[in-house]
C-alpha cells in the first residue's frame, strides 16, 4: 500500500529533510545540541534512574542477574525502532497517499485498523491494551511505594505494619489513578501526547537524575543536598514550564524585575524555547546545588553508615560473578 521499503526509506518531512535523519539544525525541536544534551538526560532517567527500573534491579537475585536483566532490557529497547518508529512513518506515508489528515496520537491504532484483518486486529489491540496496562500498573506501584514508604511511614510509625502499609498503598494508587483521570482532558491542550510526555520528563527528570547518580557515585552526597536538589528542580521546572508554554507571562515577570523589552521568543528563541535544552540547564543547576549543599553540610551518622555500606559492597567478594557468569556477561555485552 505504501510502495515498499524504498518508499518508506525515501520519506521526507514537510521541510524537505529525510524523516530518518538524526541531524537537524540548532533551532529544530530535535536539533543536534538538544540530542547531545537534553535527550541524553531523558535517556539516563528513563532507563537508569527511574523508580520502576531501580526496583527491578534491587530485587534481582544477584549482581549477575541484575546486569543480565539490564542487558536484556537494553536489547529489547532496540526493538522500539521497529515497534514504534517505523509504524509511525508507514502511517504518515499511507494516510498522506490517501489524502487524509491524521492525528499523530491516533496513528498506531488507525494503522492497525486499516491494514490488519479482523482476527489479527483483535489480537493486536488486546496486546496493545495489555502493554498499556502493564506500563500504568508499574508506574502506579512505583509511585505508591515511594509515597507510602518515604512519606507516610516516616510520619506514622504504625504504618510500618505490613497490613497498614498495604492499605495505604492501595489508597495511594486509587488517589493517583483518580488524579490521572481528571488530568487526562487537559493533555489535548498540548501538541500531542508524545510532546506532552517529553515536556514533563524534560522538566521533572533532572532533579531525580542528579539525586540518584550523586547517591551512587558521590561519596559526600547527603539528604540535605538531595532535598535541596529536588526543591531546586521543582522550582526551575515550574519556571521552565511557564517559559515554554506561556512566554508572554514569563516576559512579563522578567519585565517586572527591571528587564524591560526582554522577550524569550525574540532574544533566545533558538535555545530557550526547546524543552530539551531547558531540561539540560535544569540538570546542570541541580548538580551545582547538590555539590554546594553536600560540601557545606555534614552527613548524619546513619548516612555515613549507608555510604560506607554502599562503597564496601562494591568491593565485596560475596556477590562477585563466577568465571562462568563473567564470561556470559562479557559475551552479552559484545
Sequence positions of predicted segments:
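Membrane-embedded helix-loop-helix hairpins and adjacent transmembrane boundary segments
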Residues: 1-334
Amino acid at each position: 500500500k505504501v510502495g515498499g521499503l524504498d518508499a518508506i526509506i525515501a520519506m521526507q518531512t514537510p521541510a524537505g529533510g529525510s524523516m530518518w535523519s538524526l541531524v537537524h539544525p540548532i533551532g529544530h525541536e530535535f536539533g543536534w545540541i538538544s540530542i547531545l544534551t537534553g535527550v541524553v538526560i531523558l535517556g539516563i532517567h528513563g532507563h537508569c534512574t527511574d523508580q520502576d527500573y531501580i526496583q527491578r534491579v534491587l530485587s534481582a537475585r544477584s549482581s549477575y542477574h541484575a546486569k543480565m536483566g539490564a542487558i536484556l532490557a537494553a536489547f529489547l529497547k532496540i526493538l522500539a525502532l521497529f515497534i514504534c518508529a517505523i509504524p509511525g512513518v508507514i502511517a504518515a506515508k499511507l494516510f498522506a497517499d490517501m489524502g487524509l489528515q491524521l492525528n499523530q496520537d491516533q496513528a498506531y491504532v488507525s494503522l492497525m485498523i486499516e491494514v490488519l484483518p479482523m482476527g489479527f486486529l483483535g489480537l493486536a489491540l488486546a496486546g496493545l491494551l495489555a502493554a498499556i496496562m502493564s506500563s500504568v500498573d508499574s508506574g502506579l506501584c512505583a509511585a505508591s511505594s515511594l509515597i507510602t514508604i518515604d512519606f507516610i511511614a516516616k510520619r506514622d510509625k504504625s504504618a510500618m505494619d505490613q497490613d497498614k502499609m498495604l492499605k495505604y498503598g492501595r489508597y495511594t494508587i486509587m488517589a493517583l489513578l483518580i488524579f490521572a483521570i481528571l488530568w487526562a482532558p487537559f493533555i489535548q491542550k498540548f501538541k500531542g501526547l508524545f510532546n506532552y510526555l517529553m515536556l514533563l520528563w524534560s522538566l521533572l527528570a533532572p532533579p531525580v537524575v542528579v539525586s540518584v547518580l550523586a547517591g551512587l557515585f558521590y561519596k559526600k552526597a547527603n539528604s540535605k543536598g538531595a532535598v535541596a536538589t529536588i526543591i531546586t528542580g521543582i522550582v526551575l521546572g515550574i519556571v521552565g514550564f511557564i517559559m515554554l508554554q506561556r512566554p508572554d507571562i514569563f516576559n512579563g515577570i522578567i519585565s517586572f524585575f527591571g528587564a524591560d523589552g526582554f522577550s524569550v521568543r525574540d532574544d533566545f528563541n533558538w535555545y530557550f524555547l526547546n524543552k530539551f535544552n531547558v531540561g539540560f540547564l535544569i540538570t546542570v543547576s541541580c548538580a551545582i546545588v547538590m555539590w554546594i549543599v553536600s560540601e557545606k553540610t555534614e552527613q548524619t551518622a546513619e548516612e555515613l553508615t549507608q555510604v560506607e555500606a554502599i562503597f564496601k559492597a562494591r568491593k565485596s567478594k560475596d556477590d562477585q560473578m563466577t568465571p562462568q557468569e563473567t564470561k556470559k556477561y562479557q559475551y552479552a555485552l559484545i
